[in-house]
From Swiss-Prot:
Keywords: Ribonucleoprotein, Ribosomal protein, RNA-binding, rRNA-binding
Xref: InterPro entries: Ribosomal_uS19, Ribosomal_uS19_CS, Ribosomal_uS19_euk/arc, Ribosomal_uS19_SF
Function field: Protein S19 forms a complex with S13 that binds strongly to the 16S ribosomal RNA.
Gene Ontology terms: cellular component: cytosolic small ribosomal subunit
Pfam families for the chain: Ribosomal_S19
Record protein name field: Small ribosomal subunit protein uS19
Amino acid sequence: MAKKSSSRLPKRKGEYTYRGKTVSELQELSLEEFAELLPSRERRSLKRGFTDGQKKVLHEFKEGKKIRTHHRDMIILPEMIGKTIEIHNGKGFVSVDLQPEMVGHRFGEFAPTRSRVSHGSAGVGATRSSKFVPLK
């Protein structure tokens, strides 16, 4: 049997693609073309346009400034890949390096607002059974 020759190139290991597009292809797309690749919720958000605060963040990205933002609802675009941004989590700013895998997600997904609480052991007298524990 003869092998079928496919027009598809074999995918190189380690190369990230988003909906079949490599990072360099994504960066060449216009905002409208990129929006068509996104899931419906993010696509609708982009089609509505950016708020004034989000426009300011985009402008700072293009200038190459260090960015600190409270805009947790902003969608990560391909032109942001490779940059570092500080996202507010309600208490402080969390530094996040934007990777290709983060495209299409929102800033807030990478700056958790709640931390896990680990309580210490109960003190002497905190429970009825600890009344009888000798105090050194």
